[in-house]
UniProtKB/Swiss-Prot annotation:
The gene is rps1. Signal peptide: none annotated. The modification N-acetylalanine is found at residue 2. GO terms for biological process: translation. The lineage of its organism: Eukaryota, Fungi, Dikarya, Ascomycota, Pezizomycotina. Keywords: Acetylation, Cytoplasm, Ribonucleoprotein, Ribosomal protein. SMART domains: Ribosomal_S3Ae. Component of the small ribosomal subunit. Mature ribosomes consist of a small (40S) and a large (60S) subunit. The 40S subunit contains about 33 different proteins and 1 molecule of RNA (18S). The 60S subunit contains about 49 different proteins and 3 molecules of RNA (25S, 5.8S and 5S). The keyword ATP-binding does not apply. The keyword Acetylation applies. This is Small ribosomal subunit protein eS1. InterPro entries: Ribosomal_eS1, Ribosomal_eS1_CS, Ribosomal_eS1_euk.
């Protein structure tokens, strides 16, 4: 008889692992947009429950969500723009967010670029009155003059430089003279783009002038009172302030 363990006799039943539902340890939280947008209730996010030293609120703070502006404004004309919202505070089951940036969809940007015209881009770093440091990117395209027969609409280098200078001046002036919330209200109806188009009419006619991207470089020290004021001091209200598309700002004649 062979010396050693009899494998067949010592073999017992396999211990089956108990299946645990991972979602049982998680909670859903509501994402609330600032009052500058028409729709306040953005969606929901999932996070692990508070256990021991791990706090659920700490895991939620700093999360960034990308939302279509069409959903926030209930207007399909804004579908090509995406807004980034950052969670700054958690109250109960509600995540209070603040504006973190803006961008265009890649398909919209590609659809704007065409033959026989000049693309002009400019960017500027500005600080709002409430100490948010932002970088704004602007894009514009030349268009035909009235009664123009020539197919191409190429601008000269001197004209491009002059247009770019106007872009930087207008973006810097408009952004540095208002708060982040007020700047958001200007960006939604594209006030800055129309202002640039009007100011550069004498240099070269432009079309499709947009602030295509807003990047948040640095935020000031967190102020809970300012955030609650932005959310109307109540996270239960699902309605915000709708920014009308017809909103127009007075343009200085000297620009």
């Amino acid at each position: 008889m062979a010396v050693g363990k009899n494998k067949r006799l010592s073999k017992g039943k396999k211990g089956l692992k108990k299946k645990t539902d991972t979602f049982a340890k998680k909670d859903w939280y509501n994402i609330k947009a600032p009052g500058t947008f028409a729709v306040r209730d953005v969606g929901k996010t999932l996070v692990n429950r508070t256990t021991g030293l791990k706090n659920a609120n700490d895991a939620l703070k700093g999360r960034i969500f990308e939302v279509s502006l069409a959903d926030l404004q209930k207007d399909e004309d804004h579908a090509f723009r995406k807004v980034k919202l950052r969670v700054d505070e958690v109250q109960g089951k509600n995540c209070l967010t603040n504006f973190h940036g803006l961008d265009f969809t890649s398909d919209k940007l590609r659809s704007l670029v065409r033959k026989w015209q000049t693309l002009i881009e400019a960017n500027v770093v500005v600080k709002t009155t409430d100490d948010y440091l932002l970088r704004l990117f602007c894009i514009a395209f030349t268009k035909r003059r009235p009664n123009q027969v020539k197919k191409t609409t190429y601008a000269q280098s001197s004209q491009i430089r002059a247009i770019r200078k106007k872009m930087v001046e207008i973006m810097a002036r408009d952004a540095s003279s208002c708060t982040l919330a007020q700047l958001t209200q200007k960006l939604i109806p594209e006030v800055i783009g129309r202002e640039i188009e009007k100011a550069t009419q004498g240099i070269y006619p432009l079309q499709n002038v947009h602030v295509r991207k807003v990047k948040l470089l640095k935020a000031p020290k967190f102020d809970l009172g300012a955030l609650l004021g932005l959310h109307g001091e109540s996270s239960q209200d699902d309605s915000g302030q709708k920014v009308e598309r017809e909103f127009k700002e007075t343009v200085l004649e000297q620009v």
